Swiss-Prot record:
Primary gene name: leuS
Placement of sequence motif 'KMSKS' region: 572-576
GO cellular component: cytosol
GO molecular function: aminoacyl-tRNA deacylase activity; ATP binding; leucine-tRNA ligase activity
Catalytic activity of the protein: tRNA(Leu) + L-leucine + ATP = L-leucyl-tRNA(Leu) + AMP + diphosphate
Source organism of the structure: Clostridium botulinum (strain Hall / ATCC 3502 / NCTC 13319 / Type A)
Protein name stated in the entry: Leucine--tRNA ligase
Documented EC number(s): 6.1.1.4
Amino acid sequence: MGNYSTKIDEKWQKKWEENSLYKFNNKNLDKKLYVLEMFSYPSGSKLHAGHWFNYGPVDSWARFKRMQGYNVFQPMGFDAFGLPAENYAIKTGIHPKDSTFKNIETMETQLKAMGAMFNWENEVITCSPDYYKWTQWLFLKLYEKGLAYKKKAPVNWCPSCNTVLANEQVLDGKCERCDSNVDKKNLEQWFLKITDYADELLEKLDELDWPEKTKAMQKHWIGKSVGAEVTFNVADSDLSFNVFTTRVDTLFGVTYVVLAPENDLVDKLTTPENKAEVESYKTQAKNQSDIERQSITREKTGVFSGSYAINPINGKKVPIWIGDYVLNTYGTGCVMAVPAHDERDFAFATKYNLPIERVIEGGDSLPYTEYGGMVNSGEFDGLLGNEAKEAVISKLESMNLGRKKINYRLRDWLVSRQRYWGAPIPIIYCEKCGTVEVPIEQLPVELPYNVEFSPDGKSPLGKCDDFINTTCPKCGGPAKREADTLDTFVCSSWYYLRYPDNNNEKDAFNPELINKMLPVDKYVGGPEHACMHLLYARFITKALRDMGYLNFDEPFLSLTHQGLILGPDGLKMSKSKGNTISPDDYIKEFGADVFRMYLMFGFDYTEGGAWSDDAIKSIGKFVDRVERILENAREEIKNSKDNKSTMDKDEKELNYVRHHSIKSITEDIDKMQFNTSIARLMEFTNALSKYLGIDAIKNALFLRESIIDFITLLAPFAPHFAEEQWKLIGINSSIFNEKWPEFDPKALIKDEVEIAVQVNGKIRAKINISTSSSEDEIKESALNNEDIKNSIGDKEIKKVIVIKNRLVNIVAK
């Protein structure tokens, strides 16, 4: 074992803190670099290996950038509201505030033991009143701009968590947190109008340096569709309904229409003889989640309402069906069915023996879903694609039965939660004045401590008289506070704006400072947030820009998703499986730098992989070996009597590896390819060891320059160990104030190269030649090689082909 241990970690962490080494200078923003990892949720009592995989390597990247001359801002905080702490409190009796702050204290200690450059003076904790005061301010600003509103709506309800879930929090019909089946309820809820920004959220995506998969997920979630809205009248009635379609050119092929079970028209147009069956079907549909109902693999079901609609383009009667695959929250809650040209409609029509009529030519069989000439479509026969669509829409417009329309899959953001542990919504209800905003000067509306929060389906704050009963700020009369709390994603939708100005008591942030500090230059976190946090943060940034607070469009310019660290068994880590990895145990045994380097060398950063104890031991041995080599190098420099100043063959060989390492590591670490960066360091280590092992006079000055570069390259990956080695070579300033080395292109031009020599296409030898050798000299060296002579034997040499500095091929027969 070498001398490196947690004692060295603690020594340098103390020095860094005493010297305020990493304190951010917000007065010098010319080369600022805002580096941000998604903050952690303090639901568990400790950080696990997955947290480390997010934070450790990114800190190494930030250190590298600091050494390149950037003024790095790397804050840290905690996303501290939410269900897990409340559920833990219900289970254990420990108040969410108490457990959350205890966990935060533990995690802060762990994060500091990592030795990262976190700017702790800029810490934010979302459950602190001095933070959620400004979350409430944000809500009020959105309300003032008409971007926050309340309405009764069908919502996803988790009967176990006893709260509303956003669509994004329902996975395959189950709650993402507790795996319970999700129900539907009609409740008065608060929403944010993210749909107002649907177009811009799409348009700006391609400009971002984000993973293509994440951008594709957001595009799909927003789901822009350009088409037409068509009006169908109900036969023998004054009722009508609209449908949205992207294929209005298939309108002549409509043979039935389908309404969502929740559609208000269902009760009005269902005939008495069909009522019982329809009611039964509605009950069945109510127990399905939106995502489950939209599943591609699920068989589509429906019931006939007994009524008919009139196809506006040809006047034909078509049956009106009720089907749960139609969502009342998407489009108009009604769809037209063209079974000849839609796979879903074809399957439904086949199942229920409904007519199938071709109106687009092409394909040998049905359904045919591509574009083609219109057929069986009267005056429109022969028209294609956009021309066909335009003609049909024009006809519908002339009849006042249709128009062009753009539709979105994206729904407004539901932010009400019927739970305790969240930011109270700053709204008051007065019988005289109606809905009233809490005045800014009365913020924060503080979350009371003594509340009965056992879940019963109602908002816990509604049962707290001291909280719920208040005075109307307008008329001074008795009033009630809003009992719901805000979705935790509201808290995290703007936290990146608070970090640089976290002690501001007058405003959420100083726009002058924030507009210089942001956008975030590098954001790192898991891909699971693609359609929630990342989308919400983009929306909030744009909304605040339009209010005049921000002068930029996007919060995060560059985004990287780290991979997933699995248990030793290759499965996702969980306490129930007993395969979790505690960083603390390994740090105690190996030190923080070995743990950090293992995470960066053992896994591709964006892929992750399974944990291996053997692999971390190998990294520990590597650090010990580096320590021995650097000690030998110091001794060589110190005791060198017959020093030389020339750069001979051995020096040139080491110098080549040195500058190749500088070039490769600089390129790879910049792209967060940490594993290949450390592989280059290992090659550099081998080259140093080889040079130290030669029995010849050495160039001590060159050796010192080489180990200075080596330690500098090592520093981002093993910060404590590198600081210690830096001091041992006699330099008193921090290595993190050192300039990152630059490679010398001349050092990468070799005097000699190794080339392969083939006989009849098979490699028979390798020879070293001067890079300045002529073609004749290369031929001569190849033909004089003993292995080549033996391979040729008595054969006659017919041809010698030379590819300079790469290959010699001898043809002999």
